[in-house]
């Protein structure tokens, strides 16, 4: 079981980082297609980079769930994993920029990959410890879906933050 879990985490990390990298360029590759804009990065904002992590994590979660049906706390762990990733990207980005003033592109790329690695290590640890009780897995899944809806809505109508 331990080897199976490590293989899942490694495969997930590879697929999520590959998917996020593809999504980073997909909008430009399609000539700014409105069909891919909810899922891909339409500009270089931190928000758009959070989408690049969210969508591959969500798709991988749907596939992985088919193989982890016996994991009762699955969706709660997935929600915690996604929330951690969505918090880490802006925290790491703004911390780096706050300290050094500006971040080169390679730092932004490193932040994405480091965040992906940390969320997969976190998820592996959460499943291994099995201490996150999940009384309402459907609510956790609904929260994940709501995050996806917010990414779509805010892609087309971003909030005006002063």
Language model: regions and residue ranges:
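Short aromatic-rich membrane-water interface segments that cap or initiate transmembrane helices
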Residues: 38-51
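Small-polar-interrupted transmembrane alpha-helices in polytopic inner-membrane proteins
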Residues: 20, 24, 60-61, 77-94
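N-terminal membrane topogenic signal
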Residues: 1-12
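Terminal transmembrane helical module of multi-pass membrane proteins
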Residues: 127-162
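Alpha-helical transmembrane segments of multi-pass membrane proteins
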Residues: 15-32, 152-159
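Hydrophobic alpha-helical membrane segments
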Residues: 85-89, 108-124, 145-150
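Hydrophobic cores of alpha-helical transmembrane segments in multi-pass inner/ER membrane proteins
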Residues: 51-64, 113-124
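Membrane-interface helix caps and helix-loop-helix hairpins in membrane proteins
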Residues: 71, 95-106
